[in-house]
């Protein structure tokens, strides 16, 4: 697995909902995002109860499900895009459990996925999932929020792989309530100075530069998915707008 050190060029991770509006669009969009400067892609696995996501991504999940999304769609998209862009699956445990988590990890590895982001796996119950990920050379991405105590941070930070998903506040994606992060960032850096910290939840084209100051990268989801949901736009216009947003954010966090 690729090894990351402290980063000089700040990274951009983009979240998009898989197969919305369809597989072919997602494949084309992912490849276009790579060309627009996106470093990693969170490929969202549609689920009916996405507890960590705000109303924008929740709506996108439901739309994709209504259009008949299946895990086979996820596999076909991933196979096409993973050679061109670092690909992570972001999903909830239920769809993966239906297949079997061991089988999910094996499939992810075979398709070139680099990591899994599963918000509803409590840290206390994550050991068997971590083991399966390790066996398949996948990173199980860890979340750290301002609400975590020092002892929990001291446990999570040393075992994190690929990057730590730094939660900007305790809540759902796409909302705006924030917590002061500098003390938390300093605490994590003291424990594991090599692991990149990527800030997510509430990052958009207006605030990305400010939010990225103390971290190694940002994760942008709702700001992009909002464009996916805009029924006034054609698919071509959606792709152009999303890629322009991504390019603008990547430039702003590195300016």
UniProtKB/Swiss-Prot annotation:
One Pfam family from the record: Trp_syntA
Entry keyword Iron: no
Single annotated GO MF: tryptophan synthase activity
Top-tier EC class: lyase
Record keywords: Amino-acid biosynthesis, Aromatic amino acid biosynthesis, Lyase, Tryptophan biosynthesis
UniProt-listed PROSITE patterns: TRP_SYNTHASE_ALPHA (PS00167)
Assigned EC number: 4.2.1.20
Any single Gene Ontology cellular-component annotation: cytosol
Spans traversing the lipid bilayer: none
Domain of life: Bacteria
Catalytically driven reaction(s): (1S,2R)-1-C-(indol-3-yl)glycerol 3-phosphate + L-serine = D-glyceraldehyde 3-phosphate + L-tryptophan + H2O
Pathways involved: Amino-acid biosynthesis; L-tryptophan biosynthesis; L-tryptophan from chorismate: step 5/5
Active site, per annotation: 42, 53
Family of this protein: Belongs to the TrpA family.
Annotated function: The alpha subunit is responsible for the aldol cleavage of indoleglycerol phosphate to indole and glyceraldehyde 3-phosphate.
Subunit structure: Tetramer of two alpha and two beta chains.
HAMAP family reported for this sequence: Trp_synth_alpha
Record-linked PANTHER family: TRYPTOPHAN SYNTHASE ALPHA CHAIN, CHLOROPLASTIC, TRYPTOPHAN SYNTHASE, ALPHA CHAIN
Protein name: Tryptophan synthase alpha chain
Species, as recorded: Wolinella succinogenes (strain ATCC 29543 / DSM 1740 / CCUG 13145 / JCM 31913 / LMG 7466 / NCTC 11488 / FDC 602W) (Vibrio succinogenes)
